[in-house]
Amino acid sequence: MYADIIIKNAKCITVNNKKVFEWLAIKDEKIIAIDNGEKYNSLINKTTIILDAKGKSVLPGFIDSHFHLVQTAMNEEGVNLHNVSSFEEIGEKIKKANLKSKETIFGVRLEKENLQEKKFPDRKVLDKFSDDTPIWINNLDYQVSILNTYGLLYYKIPFRIDGIELDEKGAPTGIFTGKANATLRTNILNSYSNKNREENIRKLIPKLLEVGITTVNAMEGGYMYSDKDANFIYEHIADFPIDIVLFYQCLDLDKVREKKLKRIGGSLYIDGTRGARTAALTFEYNDKPGEMGRLIFSQKELNVFVEECYINKLQLSLYTIGDRAIETALNAHEYALEKTGIKGLRHRMEHVELASLPQIKRAEKLGLIFSMNPTYERYWEGSNKMYSERLGKRYVETNKFRETIDSGLTLCGGSDSDVCDYNPFVGIHSAVNHPVKKHRISLYEAIKMYTINGAYAIFEENNKGSLEIGKLADIIILDRDIFEIDTESIDKVKVLCTIKSGKILYNTI
């Protein structure tokens, strides 16, 4: 038997253990050999492709465990407002966009904390930039939408819906939160065609391959999103060159069963976000005394739902940010386990930003998986950033990666794209360089978050996630030996080649 592809002169990091090999061979879609020396010569014929890694690292393809695929793809077409620092800069970008199109001007990823005004622009501010075209702006975590006056009239959202901010005269300011924001977002997202979805996903995938992503956990549908997104992914899941694992973000077990899906949830909200001060805490927000966030479900409601997931043997993934939400989710899992005795479903908790040490220990005892987002630390950690503004001195308690791993819990990593950068090296860098030293993990542990642990979190550890004979040839070749660089340079690492199921889909070697 001859190999289709040989990667030689490499440092192949197996990830399932700490062994490093010099070469590997691929036939069809699988790894057929991995070893040291020059034994690969017997596997070469005239059609074998030989890739010389020149001493650089070779890793399994990355698995992003929390990725809003349709949302990210569609938002690539939007006006990126993440780094703007003033209303004036917003205006410059909107005016530039208005020259290109008379359709809705869609702004994404706006952070109030980055603005010198320290508040969101209202409709009157946006009207100065365009008064004859709808403007729709989302903040970074999608908890806030902003419309100009034309947009208010165009989208016809009833003014009596909860979450529509009113000025002193009782007129809408154009700023939508809560139910109003969710209604507006869902209405607009429902208007997208499947042709739009497909075209934009196909444009996005080469960018994912360029950073080494070969599998995404697609969090689609449900509150604040569109079920049309989830249905599109379900119907077209095999049409794209990377692996897509659908997490249908709904409460409808019948719908999930009809589709024969093995899991439910994703961003299935138990609470809100820190930015909007809706993440459910056991203490008051530092910058808003009296506010402790909110729970979406009562304990009784969540107990019933979680028990039903156990009974139906569905892997459940719950969105939990604040410690009070984490407590509620753990209570529900303990209730369901006691009622049913069913184990081994690898239920997940997403984000888990403020878990206490006792909560981490309880989660480990329950056999739960933490799906966390290290890049949050890059965006919001630090004494003058959003975590410290919202949490005060407790900002040092966020994202306990070290403690999670030490407890024995499986920890997988995701970007939460497009809230954060989907480049896995940014996530790995953030986990290794957590601003709070005691929460940091090693480079090897961080790589496992995006490879073998990500595979385990979707029951795929026997098929992918490590470089082993018989596993899928999901492989990336880096531009350097990642274990020989300074930890401060991890986010500078590039991918030279991405192989998915034995096919070279990105290559600059």
Where are these regions (language model features)?
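Acidic (Asp/Glu)-rich catalytic clusters
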Residues: 237, 256-259, 342, 363-365
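Divalent metal-binding segments
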Residues: 2-8, 13-240, 246-251, 275-308, ...
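His/Asp/Glu-enriched, well-ordered alpha-helical/loop segment
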Residues: 307-317, 324-347, 352, 372-482, ...
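Non-cysteine beta-strand/loop elements that form the S-adenosyl-L-methionine
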Residues: 68, 262-278, 368-378
